């Protein structure tokens, strides 16, 4: 079955990678514009799409890159990889990696790539993944309780729920879903599985709905729990943390980072990482330095962009999307690399994955 996918914030994302004068709300005011460098990147640069999906952002970017440029695309989803390989067969500039963006540094190094000119990450679940009941992402469609981005490996949500303790479930649902009824939901799941296992999305959605006492306007009671389980089973925040550090380390001076997030946990991590890297390192208070010798930031923020009314009207899933962008400066990285700029992954991940 063919599912339609509309890329979110399509043009602003590619603009963030290529336009010398790009700037969203909150962009650094003193940022110089290097038109020549931007044109060189566009003609011969190496770019990464860390979340190929169905290729909307990649195709838009390729349409604006020169014939000598390269684009390396990543995705965990075997169905997305099939689409990417078809694109690569048509366009020699495209290299396909079946894997998550957390492996960016290693996969690029294996292909002889040490630095890149731009990287974009679209952190949302794609429309085809949501609309395909067999993937198990939707609480509105009957399907197996799976939720894995890469269906070829790892436990499903059903596997994990069958053996997790009430406390483990509570932690995951509270930390990754920010669900205030997390304990009640965890107890309801444990009670249900004591009589019969949870195998389908609608079974879980009904179980969660029975435990969530009040409903948020316009939101299904299972929304937060499904989000939490998807994030946990796919290690989404841990992988995002690795990808952000890798991107900062890989970008050439003037290279760009563009990240689209869809919920507060992702956006908070991206925002805090960019903000930390955009703060200059502290100079020793008694060390005499000229102004030109003062520590400079690693990144300059290019601000944020949200979908306008026209896009939201045509694609409701764009309503919660936030694009944040930043540009790498020429300031050398600290000896510890970029990991110090990335905030700690909240909650359950810090306690370790016991199961």
From Swiss-Prot:
Residue ranges of the region described as Disordered: 327-355
Gene Ontology biological-process entries: rRNA base methylation
Residue sites binding S-adenosyl-L-methionine per the record: 55-57, 75, 122, 129
InterPro entries: RsmH, SAM-dep_MeTrfase_MraW_recog, SAM-dependent_MTases_sf
Catalytic activity, as annotated: cytidine(1402) in 16S rRNA + S-adenosyl-L-methionine = N(4)-methylcytidine(1402) in 16S rRNA + S-adenosyl-L-homocysteine + H(+)
Enzyme Commission number: 2.1.1.199
An example molecular function term from Gene Ontology annotations: rRNA (cytosine-N4-)-methyltransferase activity
Top enzyme class: transferase
UniProt keyword Methyltransferase, yes or no: yes
GO cellular component assignments: cytoplasm
A Pfam family that the UniProt record links to this protein: Methyltransf_5
NCBIfam families: 16S rRNA (cytosine(1402)-N(4))-methyltransferase RsmH (TIGR00006)
Function: Specifically methylates the N4 position of cytidine in position 1402 (C1402) of 16S rRNA.
Family designation: Belongs to the methyltransferase superfamily. RsmH family.
Name of the featured protein: Ribosomal RNA small subunit methyltransferase H
Provenance organism: Bordetella avium (strain 197N)
């Amino acid at each position: 079955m063919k599912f339609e996918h509309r890329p979110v914030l399509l043009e602003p994302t590619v603009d963030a990678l290529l336009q010398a004068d790009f700037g969203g709300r909150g962009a650094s005011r003193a940022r110089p514009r290097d038109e020549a460098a931007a044109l060189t990147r566009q003609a011969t640069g190496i770019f990464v799409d860390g979340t190929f999906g169905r290729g909307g952002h990649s195709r838009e970017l390729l349409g604006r890159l020169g014939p000598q440029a390269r684009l390396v695309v990543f995705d965990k989803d075997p169905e997305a990889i099939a689409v990417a390989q078809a694109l690569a067969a048509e366009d020699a500039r495209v290299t396909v990696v079946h894997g998550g963006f957390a492996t960016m540094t290693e996969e690029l190094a294996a292909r002889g790539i040490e630095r890149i000119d731009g990287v974009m990450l679209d952190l949302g679940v794609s429309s085809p993944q949501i609309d395909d009941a067999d993937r198990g992402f939707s609480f509105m469609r009957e399907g197996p309780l799976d939720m894995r981005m890469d269906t070829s490996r790892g436990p499903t949500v059903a596997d994990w729920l069958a053996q997790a303790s009430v406390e483990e479930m509570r932690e995951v649902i509270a930390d990754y879903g920010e669900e205030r009824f997390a304990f009640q939901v965890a107890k309801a799941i444990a009670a249900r599985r004591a009589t019969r296992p949870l195998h389908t999305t609608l079974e879980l959605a009904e179980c969660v709905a029975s435990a969530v006492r009040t409903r948020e306007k316009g939101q299904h009671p299972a929304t937060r729990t499904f989000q939490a389980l998807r994030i946990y089973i796919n290690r989404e925040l841990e992988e995002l943390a690795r990808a952000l550090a890798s991107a900062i380390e890989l970008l050439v001076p003037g290279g760009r980072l563009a990240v689209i997030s869809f919920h507060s946990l992702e956006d908070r991590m991206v925002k805090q990482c960019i903000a930390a890297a955009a703060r200059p390192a502290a100079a020793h208070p008694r060390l005499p330095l000229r102004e030109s010798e003062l520590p400079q930031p690693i990144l300059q923020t290019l601000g944020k962009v949200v979908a306008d009314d026209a896009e939201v009207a045509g694609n409701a899933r764009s309503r919660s999307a936030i694009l944040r962008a930043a540009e790498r400066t020429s300031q050398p990285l600290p000896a510890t690399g970029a990991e110090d700029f990335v905030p700690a992954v909240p909650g359950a991940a810090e306690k370790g994955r016991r199961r």
